[in-house]
Curated annotation (Swiss-Prot):
S-adenosyl-L-methionine binds at N23, I25, G50, E72, D97, N149. It catalyses: adenosine(1518)/adenosine(1519) in 16S rRNA + 4 S-adenosyl-L-methionine = N(6)-dimethyladenosine(1518)/N(6)-dimethyladenosine(1519) in 16S rRNA + 4 S-adenosyl-L-homocysteine + 4 H(+). One of its GO terms (molecular function) is 16S rRNA (adenine(1518)-N(6)/adenine(1519)-N(6))-dimethyltransferase activity. The gene is rsmA. It is found in: Cytoplasm. It comes from the Bacteria. This is Ribosomal RNA small subunit methyltransferase A. PANTHER family: DIMETHYLADENOSINE TRANSFERASE (PTHR11727), DIMETHYLADENOSINE TRANSFERASE-RELATED (PTHR11727:SF7). Its EC number is 2.1.1.182. Keywords: Cytoplasm, Methyltransferase, RNA-binding, rRNA processing, S-adenosyl-L-methionine, Transferase.
Amino acid sequence: MLPSIAKHAALHQVNPLRKHGQNFIFDSSLCDKIVRASNLAENSRVLEIGPGTGGLTRSILQKNPESLTVIETDERCLPLLNEIKEYYPNLNIIKQDALKINLTDLSCDIVNSVGFAYKKREAKPITNRRANDIGESKLIDYKVTIISNLPYHIGTELVIRWLKEARLITSMTLMLQKEVVERICAIPSTKAYGRLSVICQLIAKVEKCFDVAPTAFYPPPKVYSAIVKLIPLENPLSIALINKVEQITKLAFAGRRKMIKSSLKNLVPNIHEVLTQLNINDNYRAENLAPQDYLRIAEIL
C-alpha cells in the first residue's frame, strides 16, 4: 500500500524547488475534486504535466484510465513516480521539459503496450496502425484528456500550444493562477477580457470550476489558484487562422484604450471599409469586440 502523498514525498526527500515552480498538493480530497471536475471517462488516455509528488496522479489512476502519461522534468520525483507505477502499470513516465513536447510527438504504441511512447525526433518512427501519414509526421487519430496542476510560469504558454492541437484533445482540466483563469473565461467589455479570452473561446468551450486557496499548497503561493475546464469545439480552427487571430489581437490589445480602427490601421490600411463590411462599429475598443468579431476580421483578411 502506498503511503500518504506527504509521507511519500518525505521518504524520497522531495522538497519543492522554486526553479521548477513547484507548489505541491498533499490533500488527496482536493486531487479527487479536480479529477471529478474533469468528468474523466473510464478507459480514457490521460496526459498530466508536472506530476511532482503524484497526488493528482493517484487520483487520476483511481479512475481506471486506459493509460496515464506523466511528463516530469525533476529527476528527484522519478523514483517516487516509479513506485506508484508498481501499483498502476498503466502509468507511463517521461522525463522531459513539457515545453519541448508536442501532442503530435506522443504516439500510441499498440504493439508492445497500451498507452504512450514518446517519439524523439532522432529516433526511428513508431509503427502505429492508428495514425495517418502526413508527410514525415504522424497525426494521431485518438484523443487525450489533459488533467494538470500547471506551473504558473509556463501555464499560459502550454494552454495556447495545446489549443493549436485541439483536434487531439477531448478536454483539458487545469489548475492555473486564478487571474489567468479569469482571463480565459472573461466576457467582452470587462477588465479581464483580452487576447487569451479571445483565443481560448474561439477554440474551446471554457468553464471556471472552482477556486483553490493558497493554503492548499506546500509551500503556499502568494496568489489564489483556480480550476478551469476547456472542451475543444467541433471543427477546430486551422493553425493559419489561429495565427492570424493572434496577430490581430496582439495589435488590438496593445492599445487597449484605442479605437479598433486606430489599433489595426497598420495591419489593414482600409480597416474602416473592412469593419463597415462586417458591421462592426469602428469606434469600438479592443475589449468591446466579441471573439467571433476577431474571427470574422481574420477570415476576411
